[in-house]
């Protein structure tokens, strides 16, 4: 099997489930992209992706023409992507509260936010355990409400895969979705 196949296989089931809702035109932001597992998954589905992290060498090494990279300190006060607009934003295993309320202004109307990260109680299973990096109960729902997002799906649960953890997951639309939500995605 190829490295590309292995990377895609490691993509989050949450991202896999809701990626088909992303409008086909436009640019998808993979924020805190890490190894590029979601960038590569999205590119394999035909999306153009901007993969952003403090170290993007692993993503660059994938050599996919639909993926462009940008190396950024994600916790700087002034963030150069605030003026950009995306058709979707994907965030997994990353939380920096001072910037979370900036995400909606970077998302085009009718487009998708897919967010999944660790939640309170995760310290029982390992890292992260610092409360600064763990979502409080219902925090992503409160975020969605604060910014008038339509929630497609939300979970605040214990998972066993890829490792035992407490996570919150949100798929939400800014305004009305540009396309019909298929029944399989409706709660």
Task: Show where each model-derived region lies.
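S-adenosyl-L-methionine
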Residues: 1-23
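Conserved class I S-adenosyl-L-methionine
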Residues: 25-34
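Class I SAM-dependent methyltransferase SAM/SAH-binding core
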Residues: 36-76
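A short acidic, Gly/Pro-enriched loop at the edge of an enzyme's catalytic core
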Residues: 79-88
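A short, conserved alpha-helix within the catalytic core of class I
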Residues: 95-107
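Conserved beta-strand signature within the Rossmann-like core of class I S-adenosyl-L-methionine
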Residues: 111-122
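Short alpha-helix
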Residues: 132-148
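Core SAM-dependent methyltransferase catalytic element
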Residues: 159-187
């Amino acid at each position: 099997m190829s490295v590309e196949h292995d990377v895609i296989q490691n993509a989050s089931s949450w991202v896999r489930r809701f990626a088909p809702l992303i409008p086909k035109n436009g640019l998808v932001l993979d924020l805190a992209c890490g190894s590029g597992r979601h960038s590569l998954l999205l590119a394999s589905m035909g999306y153009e992706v901007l993969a952003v992290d403090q170290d993007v060498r692993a993503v660059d090494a994938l050599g996919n023409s639909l993926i462009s990279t940008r190396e950024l300190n994600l916790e700087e006060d002034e963030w150069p992507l605030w003026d950009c607009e995306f058709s979707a934003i994907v965030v997994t295993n990353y939380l920096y509260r001072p910037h979370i309320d900036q995400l909606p202004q970077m998302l085009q109307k009718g487009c998708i936010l897919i967010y999944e990260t660790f939640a309170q109680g995760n310290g029982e299973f390992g890292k992260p355990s610092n409360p600064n990096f763990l979502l409080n109960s219902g925090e992503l729902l409160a975020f969605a409400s604060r910014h008038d997002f339509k929630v497609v799906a939300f979970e605040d649960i214990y998972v066993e895969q890829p490792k035992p953890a407490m996570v919150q997951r949100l798929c939400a639309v800014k305004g009305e979705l540009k396309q019909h939500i298929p029944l399989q995605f409706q709660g």
